[in-house]
Curated annotation (Swiss-Prot):
Function of the protein: Mitochondrial DNA endonuclease involved in intron homing. It introduces a specific double-strand break in the DNA of the COX1 gene and thus mediates the insertion of an intron, containing its own coding sequence (group I intron), into an intronless gene. Recognizes with limited specificity and cleaves the sequence 5'-ATCTTCTCTTGATTAGCCCTGATCTACGG-3' after the nucleotide sequence ATTA leaving a four-base overhang and a 3'-OH.
UniProt record, GO biological process: aerobic respiration; movement of group I intron; mRNA processing; respiratory electron transport chain; RNA splicing
Subcellular location: Mitochondrion; Membrane
Record's protein name: Intron-encoded DNA endonuclease aI5 alpha
pH-activity note: Optimum pH is 9.5.
Keywords for this protein: Endonuclease, Hydrolase, Intron homing, Membrane, Mitochondrion, mRNA processing, mRNA splicing, Nuclease, Transmembrane, Transmembrane helix
Topology with respect to the bilayer: Multi-pass membrane protein
Post-translational modification: The mature protein may arise from proteolytic cleavage of an in-frame translation of some COX1 exons plus the intron containing the aI5_alpha open reading frame.
Species this protein is from: Saccharomyces cerevisiae (strain ATCC 204508 / S288c)
Entry's Gene Ontology cellular component terms: mitochondrion; respiratory chain complex IV
Family matches, as PROSITE patterns: COX1, COX1_CUB
Residues that span the membrane, as ranges: 16-36, 57-77, 101-121, 147-167, 182-202, 235-255, 267-287, 305-325, 417-437, 464-483
Gene3D superfamilies in UniProt: Cytochrome c oxidase-like, subunit I domain, Homing endonucleases
Keyword Glycoprotein found: no
Length: 630
């Protein structure tokens, strides 16, 4: 048994080994990703106690594990070894022993990578290993050297596998199978093998030069010795961008076969799909510097790489629309698989649009001189100061670590688990009045389905209060996916216009729903004392408060029992020293705040009240009579 798995030259056995390694690496990489996400879930240090080096080491480990030890071994080594010989009618690959060596080099690389994280403080260089952060001055120990050796070993493994797949495809096809008759998955592995063969030597050269700089006193990337660290970036991204297609083209091949299976017909335009994959692979070598816009490329260089990148959308579009041309059968048992394919196609369409917008950045940087809010109108002013920011950095932030420059998305990631306190106070005031949290717009979901989905926050206001609704929307814009919409509501037979917005369905709102709801009934949370402040009271008044003649205030809180209203009233008395009583109006109880309490409350909440909502106060009367506004 041991001999079979250690010395096997059978392509299927080796494919199983690739899958096992990929699963192990995927679990380790996912664990690192969870630690990273938990650390970023809220501002400040959460679990790593401010150890930024450890955070960087986790980023390096996660990236290298996922790219070189999960996706590439699974898609190329696993599916390629298992399916390619079967699809071309070969008994095995052309070089079975090289195939075995190609796999067993990978675990050695994994050992080097794990060792690099344990030596001294680890390799905290970021997954791109840019100098001078990866130079001997920043990382004097052997951790970066071990990480470079790990990359070398994965490169050797991929090169051996690529040579094996190319020779197998060219020389071991069954009789009568010409190149034009090859299945699309075989073509995808064949094209990917050429990409590996052409790009990996460049990466190996770059990291070897870095290794020499670190250990043999050369100056390839050392500025003080006449070197240029930008050279490393060019070498890395000449490999890095084809690597994107190395990862996705085998997926293209798999999706093509799945689409063909469920449509029960060949993929539309099979030959054009092959040429599209080849074009994507070729153009992938001509666009690497779109990852480097921020390093100071001249205008002509940026214009070339922008144009070349946009051209890649043409062969990608051919593939997308060829998949869309295949209608699916009416087999009801395959709905989940159809949804999977449709979602994959939607994802590709979104990526195409993102690529198009991303590559207009050069035009925006050269021609646009306006405010940042006009570029990102939904960016939160609490996170970005428009007059003190480098617009080029924000626009080209897509190309750094896919996090800078996307304020909407990064804010969602930050607050998926917990809502920041300043927003939580506001939402508490709104949820006690007109706001509510629901599961979905569909009413036919069973209980099991409801438990598996996240919740969203909703708010409706009449057109009179549209400015207030837009103000709340701007505060929560990084949770939202669309702008507020106008709807026609009917109350007691009368129609009137109102505005409504709702957020994305996120875990943070699910947690809020568990606090404020019991089933479908809104309740008062037990920890309401900690969730209220003066800003919460201001939003309670703006949402559903009304002043009466004489200076008193009614809080028309929604859907609460008498006991819950008494509980809220006691909190207002204890925490804010407000004298409140219960009044019954139209068979409903409301909280009435006496005029003396309103006098004390008004200066505290005045700064939170919007100008359009001050009609609820007689401002001139309060200024003149009580002299409470500075």
């Amino acid at each position: 048994m041991v001999q079979r798995w250690l010395y096997s030259t059978n392509a299927k056995d080796i494919a199983v080994l690739y899958f096992m390694l990929a699963i192990f690496s995927g679990m380790a990489g996912t664990a690192m990703s969870l630690i990273i996400r938990l650390e970023l879930a809220a501002p400040g240090s959460q679990y790593l106690h401010g150890n930024s080096q450890l955070f960087n080491v986790l980023v390096v480990g996660h990236a290298v594990l996922m790219i070189f030890f999960l996706v590439m071994p699974a898609l190329i080594g696993g599916f390629g070894n298992y399916l390619l010989p079967l699809m071309i009618g070969a008994t095995d690959t052309a070089f079975p022993r090289i195939n075995n060596i190609a796999f067993w080099v990978l675990p050695m690389g994994l050992v080097c990578l794990v060792t690099s994280t344990l030596v001294e403080s680890g390799a905290g260089t970021g997954w791109t290993v840019y100098p001078p952060l990866s130079s001997i001055q920043a990382h004097s120990g052997p951790s970066v050297d071990l990480a470079i050796f790990a990359l070398h070993l994965t490169s050797i493994s991929s090169l051996l596998g690529a040579i094996n797949f190319i020779v197998t495809t060219l020389n071991m096809r069954t009789n009568g199978m010409t190149m034009h008759k090859l299945p699309l998955f075989v073509w995808s592995i064949f094209i990917t093998a050429f990409l590996l063969l052409l790009s990996l030597p460049v990466l190996s050269a770059g990291i070897t030069m870095l290794l020499l700089d670190r250990n043999f006193n050369t100056s390839f990337f050392e500025v003080s010795g006449g070197g240029d660290p930008i050279l490393y970036e060019h070498l890395f991204w000449f490999f890095g961008h084809p690597e994107v297609y190395i990862l996705i083209i085998p997926g293209f091949g798999i999706i093509s076969h799945v689409v063909s299976t469920y449509s029960k017909k060949p993929v539309f335009g099979e030959i054009s799909m092959v040429y599209a994959m080849a074009s994507i692979g070729l153009l992938g070598f001509l666009v690497w510097s779109h990852h480097m816009y921020i390093v100071g490329l001249d205008a002509d260089t940026r214009a070339y790489f922008t144009s070349a990148t946009m051209i890649i959308a043409i062969p990608t579009g051919i593939k997308i629309f060829s998949w869309l041309m295949n209608p699916f059968s009416k087999d009801k048992n395959k709905n989940k698989n159809k949804k999977l394919i449709r979602n994959y196609q939607k994802m590709n369409n979104n990526n195409m649009m993102k690529t198009y917008l991303n590559n207009n950045n050069m035009i925006m940087m050269n021609m646009y001189k306006g405010n940042l809010y006009d570029i990102y109108p939904r960016s939160n002013r609490n996170y970005i100061q428009p007059n003190n920011i480098n617009k080029e950095l924000v626009v080209y932030g897509y190309n750094l670590e896919s996090c800078v420059g996307m304020p909407t998305y990064t804010n969602i990631v930050k607050h998926m688990v917990g809502i920041p306190n300043n927003i939580l106070y506001i939402m508490t005031g709104i949820l006690l009045t007109d706001g509510w949290i629901d599961y979905t717009s569909k009413k036919d979901l069973d209980k099991k389905t409801i438990m598996e989905i996240n919740c969203r926050f909703r708010l409706k206001q009449s057109m009179i209060h549209s400015e207030y609704l837009m103000y709340v929307f701007m505060l929560l814009s990084h949770y939202c996916m669309s702008y507020p919409k106008m709807k026609i509501a009917k109350v007691k037979g009368k129609s009137y216009n109102q505005l409504e917005f709702y957020t994305r369905s996120l875990p943070c709102f699910t947690i809020l729903r568990y606090m404020f709801y019991n089933g479908r009934v809104k309740i008062v949370p037990n920890n309401l004392y900690d969730l209220l402040n003066y800003e919460s009271l201001a939003h309670m008044i703006m949402c559903d408060g009304s002043f009466v003649k004489g200076g008193g205030l009614y809080l028309n809180l929604q859907s609460f029992t008498t006991k819950e209203l008494i509980f809220i009233m006691n909190i207002l008395k204890i925490k804010f020293n407000l004298n409140c009583t219960l009044h019954k109006s139209r068979n409903k109880y409301t909280i009435y705040m006496r005029v003396e309490s309103v006098k004390r409350l008004f200066p505290m909440i005045y700064k939170y009240i919007l100008p359009s909502m001050r009609y609820k106060f007689d401002i001139m009367l309060w200024q003149k009579k009580y002299n409470m506004i500075n």
